[in-house]
């Protein structure tokens, strides 16, 4: 039996259902016709997170009859995804939901009505996008293009060449991603200043602000260079015309996994293999993702919005969106991930999920979340912080089907310690009721990071450090230390003082805060010899 992921292949409904696939329960051809005639929702970024989350929520609305149109997807970075994966499969995709109990759910997602290359070199597709952006029916354009997609400058603060070229050329011949989006908004402006919501759903802080600043930079440059009609910048800056809601998204969607590919091939799925595009995107006819997901959205849509609330999106005000982000980043998810990443690298783990089988590491992250973090958590009111941690520690991180690695999460740790742990320390310092003496696990993570920077695991074997922009700055503090050599604590204290007092890394001056001794004690303990990291953590958690 062969299952073909095409519109014609879905006609063999019994074969798909016999293999355990949930199929679209709506008239897909009618949906496609309606969506093309009266498009409501365009999404930029055709990658895995879109197919696993946004496209599936559109399908839920279609399945339960609360909405009659799907989503149009446009890809402006790697258009091979559209040509080589979307269109050969008639814009169908398979969502494989990976559950913590080891089971999988398989869903054929059919809500994508049209897929387009957001590329001015592909004139028919870009002309179609321009047409869509002039439609009265268009309510929102959402984005998952990664945080880098909103960047207009390089690390030196200079405009990227493509951005500078677009600023000078105007909206008719854009090549940068944000330039394309600005060009399409200009079409909407020319069509009568029609309202629309531009919604970043990328996993970055204040994402709506990032999108707004990027697009208004184009409008400002184009007006200044007299490349657009007067009023375009004012149109973008009028929230009753164009809004930029802030959002918080939370769903882990790794690249296509070989074990999932094998399951689907055993079902009879034809052409299940992933492809790697010339831009190094891994894409397959399927996406594998965890079951847990959140999308909290600032409810500001000047032209209305689809009934996304009925598919699990949480609509609220900007302050609550911000609180949700702080809850997640400062307490309930990200600090736990970083702790496991650092010690996972030191203790030779290859999967985050495997670490949760270690009772010492499990106890450590439970202490960070429940005991040290929850007393100062920002409670958004729409989600329970304790329930969020419960889900993270009992369902999400232990999920054996989620191929997430400590090495991936350890990337850029120097940029993460401040927000993930420093904010908690600041809250303790500011509170008359709380005592810094209760912080035991967080200083151990800092000590673990110092030990990690040595590039030597707990067996004494070398390993490659994950990429980090400050490695050249911070590694020299520890690179000459040796395992098992007696450490002169006083000399070490002086050597490390400039690092431990660096509030840009830790969020606070650890010496001034009175936490440096705790960090040093744990670090010296971890230097005693092979196995010292595990021994230090075991002794520490035995006191919890």
Roles of regions detected by a PLM:
Residues 1-44, 48-544:
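Substrate/ligand-engaging "lid" and interaction regions
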